[in-house]
Amino acid sequence: MMKRILTATAVALFLSVGGVAQAQETLSSPGAGYEIVPVAEGLDHPWSLTFMPDGSMLIIELTGQIRILREGVVSPDPVAGVPEVYFESQGGLFDVLLDPDFAENGTVYLSYAHGTPDENGTRVARAHFDGAALSEIDVIFDAQPTKDTPVHYGGRMVFLPDDTLLVTVGDGFDYREEAQKLDADLGKIIRINRDGSVPEDNPFVGREDVRPEIWSYGHRNMQGILYDEASGRVYEHEHGARGGDEINIIEPGKNYGWPVITWGVDYSGARISPYTEYEGMEQPVLYWTPSIAPSGFTLYRGTAFPQWDGDLFVGALAAQHVRRVDMEDGKPVGQEELFGELGKRIRDVRTGPDGYLYLVTDGEDGSVLRVEPGE
């Protein structure tokens, strides 16, 4: 039987690692007492969550399983019909996203790694979901070229108001130069229609030797993307190497610099580039050195914690907390570390339809936790 495990008051710890041009404050949340309530435990490398219209929840496991949580109970049998994934290191099943017309058509979108050790990549498929099984699997995107590394896939997805789909595609680690090449999907955010076709207003449509699905480029390992309806902005975050994790505001056709500019160094300590700025390349709105290893992303618009309205929440794998970023007109003005008392790697963070925050902890014995107001 699961019990409420923590009661705490949000307290800021430090703000020495975030870098932006504008000065920021170290924040705390007076009166933001919270309780952290276990929702599901004993999960096998949980990666993300999907909230369903009927109040149930899909829990996506990297191993290729989708678990259904209904009325507080995780179904012992995973969703049937999930396509085969390439499960190795960071490869596996990443996200499940509901079609904008899911109530009418029952369509979902899955992002996952596919292929073999020598040839693998990020794939997106759509399928029909009847509440228990997937059927009518239709592959709508395969990142090109394939690669021989089991890391840096990206695979986060979000729909825009025009019903086009954005998908993050990582640089493949050993292929970082591809992030600057417009004939490759690696290190890019791509934008496609629901059937996989390319929107006519994509920024590079009509150019020779350019993949028309590319929406932005110069990215590394993107583990979070979201669309803010209030501002119309697309926010994305990505891992640096040793330092240089970033939050960016994404605009079509823009170059976000990797690996020509970076605020980090290589894992060996070697310099990746002499540049932190370069003409024609965008600066992050926020970067972290040393790295926090960001994963999962939500912009809070719930009612349970009104003092956090409009703030960004970023899961931190290495730092083992959730980072709250106070945003004003697209600029960070302060940060706060939350939920570090868990001592867990945070793989995903979402805002639920009930207005609570939901956290996914990483690993072979992962969990889903709900953050509720407390004393």
Predicted features by range, described:
Residues A23-E35, V74, A133-L134, S197-R207, ...:
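Blade/loop signatures of beta-propeller domains
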Residues V37-A40, S75-P83, A133-D142, G196-F204, ...:
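Beta-propeller fold detector
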Residues V167-L186, G244-E246, I250, V368:
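Short, conserved, GDST-rich strand-edge loop motifs in beta-rich repeat architectures
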